[in-house]
Amino acid sequence: MRADVRVEAGKIAEIGELSVQAGEEVRDAAGLFVLPGFVDIHIHAYAGADCMRGEADVRRMSEGLLKTGVAAFVPTTMSAYPEETNRALLGIQAVKDHPCEHGAAVLGAHMEAPFLCPKYKGAQLEECLCLPTVEAYENMTHGVDCVRMMTLAPELPGALDMVAYLKAHGVVT
């Protein structure tokens, strides 16, 4: 299919047979594919950067991911002590609130732990896992509002109450 694509403010505005407007930049994509940017909703690290290490690493991830076609992403934390998780979330929040000029957008954070069943923890650190409580969650998330996703084990005591709490706060479980 041959078509022109007009991009305004980083978003596709029109597709069809278009006339070039004054001052518009034109790029020839003949023989190429023009696709929307990808969204990665579960990524811990990229190109040597790890979201658990804070803002500088999240910025490196953002800038590197955009070059691969990822337009937006949800940095994913792993099991860690509460203060480490909070530090990681503060870094994610900083990049979400003040995005890189040439980077993939940070849509929020995905907390993959600590509310997991030790039996099914995968690569998560067992000593950092705990039961799902509002107190534990707020201890890790104080000062941030960037959490958008939470992986938690529904079989744990308190899990269903935690799911209701998270849903009320706009967090997908």
Question: Where are the model-predicted features located?
Answer:
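Active-site mouth loops of central-metabolism enzymes
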Residues: 1, 44-56, 122-130
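Histidine-rich, glycine-flanked metal-binding segment
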Residues: 1-35
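Divalent metal-coordination and catalytic microenvironments
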Residues: 10, 31, 42, 65, ...
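Divalent metal-dependent hydrolysis catalytic cores, especially in the metallo-beta-lactamase
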Residues: 44, 59-88, 104-117, 144-155, ...
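Metal-dependent catalytic neighborhoods of phosphoester/phosphodiester hydrolases
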Residues: 51, 83-94
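Short acidic, glycine/serine/threonine-rich loops at helix termini
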Residues: 85-88, 119-125, 162-163
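Histidine/acidic residue-rich metal-binding segments in metalloenzymes
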Residues: 95, 130-173
